[in-house]
Amino acid sequence: MEGPLSVFGDRSTGEAIRSQNVMAAASIANIVKSSLGPVGLDKMLVDDIGDVTITNDGATILKLLEVEHPAAKVLCELADLQDKEVGDGTTSVVIIAAELLKNADELVKQKIHPTSVISGYRLACKEAVRYISENLIINTDELGRDCLINAAKTSMSSKVIGINGDFFANLVVDAVLAIKYTDIRGQPRYPVNSINVLKAHGRSQMESMLINGYALNCVVGSQGMPKRIVNAKIACLDFSLQKTKMKLGVQVVITDPEKLDQIRQRESDITKERIQKILATGANVILTTGGIDDMCLKYFVEAGAMAVRRVLKRDLKRIAKASGATVLSTLANLEGEETFEASMLGQAEEVVQERICDDELILIKNTKARTSASVILRGANDFMCDEMERSLHDALCVVKRVLESKSVVPGGGAVEAALSIYLENYATSMGSREQLAIAEFARSLPVIPNTLAVNAAQDSTDLVAKLRAFHNEAQVNPERKNLKWIGLDLVNGKPRDNKQAGVFEPTIVKVKSLKFATEAAITILRIDDLIKLHPESKDDKHGGYEDAVHSGALDA
């Protein structure tokens, strides 16, 4: 018989670790729970150097938390994944995952094997997604532009810009429609990254504006340069245009003093030749991420070109994509010679420096390859502008998803209530042991309407009971099928037809959040053993394994 292997750390197994994981997930969900819905509250997060962030965006809250527990980290990554994949629904996905875990833990405590629970959850998720696609989808073609505006307003309702929802919803829809392009397969695409969001504090929210073109928070390099260029040919450079200096450590021994002047002259000429090569191709707008010194600016002024220095690399890449330019980090080709060709230039109808709000901006209008748009946000202070930007990002992603999938579902807890009733009935039709797991899955979903009602200071028990009664009637009685659009009206505290009220969410937000939440719950549920290794102290001369050998723990 072998002796036990000495593990240099702590080990917890079975029910203890499962309960610990469920508790960790519940505590993460409790942090974001109160920020769900149109009347959700904000969180103030202060980091270790004192920077303050005020937000109610689930993904941002969880990103800024320093979470130690490994199971809690899974939920933080889950919110981040939902934010990257869909852009909205980050808070609800965490709440659903935590609730699924809590109910699964109850089943495991009743001696039902985790594998049965997992297969039941998978089946329930699959069935829920099928039910959404067959019964709850509203096609956007029949609703038109209003549908996009309503989806954007629903996304913004819980945010700081929700008060001016009508204004911002129109702005967001116009911005997304402005950047539409068709890919190789003929599918319309809406790259949200093509929309540049600039923030300027001061004035009111309502003075935010949408600009047709890419706005750069830069000015021309010299006052002598033209402020407007029509039929612009744009060169995008990722290096500095400055007098070439020899590298440190290079030693040149000169016997003739005149040679020193020649070296200095050559240093100037190298940069001059580069600029002449760029200008010879017809370039009249030069954007660079580095600096441009006065000597180089002189050549651009003489040529009547516009040069802009210290452009952000992110902006340069987007402009290159929109105008069809190539971003160059050097002019050297494979032979080691410096060349610049006209094919590397991007094209735009007009590049102009304008005074917008209180700042000078450079606008690149009607780019050749793709269209671009910019939004300038105004707000009382920096915290507000940052939160407005996050809210706008969510709304842009929602409108993009609606346009690409061409379908929406009713919001306000309608989908969760309908699925809860359907899955309860579906569970009773199952003869296998997954029945209990599907019933628990169904019991977990009303946590969303429940939390919405609690956050709105309404009687959640009463409201959710009424909501479930409506949905039960809709599924049992074919004549009253239209009751399936019933969701919560959180202002007046009663159920209402959310299809008529215009409370819409993209179908993909609901489908993905159900799938992601189920997968996260299953991932944590499968864990039955946690081995946490102790950090190896520097004083120890032996590692954990060596300690075990010396202590005789490994002897047979």
UniProtKB/Swiss-Prot annotation:
Its main location: cytoplasm. InterPro entries: Chap_CCT_alpha, Chaperone_TCP-1, Chaperonin_TCP-1_CS, Cpn60/GroEL/TCP-1, GroEL-like_apical_dom_sf, GROEL-like_equatorial_sf, TCP-1-like_intermed_sf, TCP-1_chaperonin. One of its GO terms (biological process) is protein folding. SUPFAM superfamilies: GroEL apical domain-like, GroEL equatorial domain-like, GroEL-intermediate domain like. ATP binds at residues 37, 89-91. Keywords: Acetylation, ATP-binding, Chaperone, Cytoplasm, Cytoskeleton, Hydrolase, Magnesium, Metal-binding, Nucleotide-binding, Phosphoprotein. Residues 536-549 have a biased composition (Basic and acidic residues). GO terms for molecular function: ATP binding; ATP hydrolysis activity; ATP-dependent protein folding chaperone; unfolded protein binding. The modification N-acetylmethionine is found at residue 1. It is an enzyme of class 3 (hydrolase). It catalyses: ATP + H2O = ADP + phosphate + H(+). Residues 536-556 are annotated as: Disordered. One of its GO terms (cellular component) is chaperonin-containing T-complex. It is found in: Cytoplasm, Cytosol; Cytoplasm, Cytoskeleton, Microtubule organizing center, Centrosome. Its EC number is 3.6.1.-. Mg(2+) binds at residue 88. The modification Phosphotyrosine is found at residue 181. The modification N6-acetyllysine is found at residues 199, 400, 494. Coiled coil: none annotated. ADP binds at residues 37, 89-92, 158-159, 412, 505. CDD domains: TCP1_alpha (cd03335). Belongs to the TCP-1 chaperonin family. Component of the chaperonin-containing T-complex (TRiC), a molecular chaperone complex that assists the folding of actin, tubulin and other proteins upon ATP hydrolysis. The TRiC complex mediates the folding of WRAP53/TCAB1, thereby regulating telomere maintenance. As part of the TRiC complex may play a role in the assembly of BBSome, a complex involved in ciliogenesis regulating transports vesicles to the cilia. Component of the chaperonin-containing T-complex (TRiC), a hexadecamer composed of two identical back-to-back stacked rings enclosing a protein folding chamber. Each ring is made up of eight different subunits: TCP1/CCT1, CCT2, CCT3, CCT4, CCT5, CCT6A/CCT6, CCT7, CCT8. Interacts with PACRG. Interacts with GBA1. Interacts with DLEC1. This is T-complex protein 1 subunit alpha. The gene is TCP1.
